[in-house]
């Protein structure tokens, strides 16, 4: 009987030692490292399963080679590093420098920006611009449902593809998990290049359950772009039941579209392994646009070397003098963001947070 105990002990050590070494080498915050070690120590088998699905530090993964990422980011944006008559307000310069230095997110002047908070207005504008496309349409969305609205947008894309316009579509595999394959296959048969982002067979049991593409980007001919929180689904227009859907989306015309194009083409390389960097996708900006709206598009991802957007929030909160108003459908902040919010509030800055009701995460203390 004693031999069985020794066997169990050896098995436990054989599992625990590599598991703990893996956690220690994962280069995470000390508190998180200790928490995972305790979970593994007291629940070794269950703890390993939890760690595989939820604990791995994906920021260290290189899903795109450094050379390809360099060509898609730095080289595609290099000519925009120096822009004539670019005036950045002094109080915004530190923040914009932060994004430029760590994300190659260059600010662009003279943009026309329209804000949509109504789904009808957004879809009408999107369909209109799709109808005006002459060279290419690049659409990147988390949800593209096969409902009445989804078919309306799909038909518009198919019409343009049949006219010879290049149409590229990326949808998230988890976001569109319930959408029938025939919906996207119909678009492929019409000549649209369609790819799903990180396909998974069982979304609820994948280690990349939160490793999804939530971007909602559309770039048309490199001259007009859309970005925001609205997916392609009927509920974003008609709401759900008696409740109206409230979200925000932007239409950008001007140099800021170059940044949206870059974000899409990075995602496209990831799903298609095709390096699209031809300058025809970055056409000259219409000289008639003189709105004087400064645009800087910042992207972030689990594989980026820096948590760009999180650092931006911290910087915004700590440099604010009067107020910071935040609106989000999900509020699960990191400790640095919470610390910055508390610090700013204690310094007398008016911090306001707008979230939907009801919420399922009432454990946060601000």
What are these model-predicted stretches?
Residues 1-311, 315, 319, 343, ...:
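N-terminal localization/anchoring segments of enzymes in phospholipid and broader phosphate metabolism
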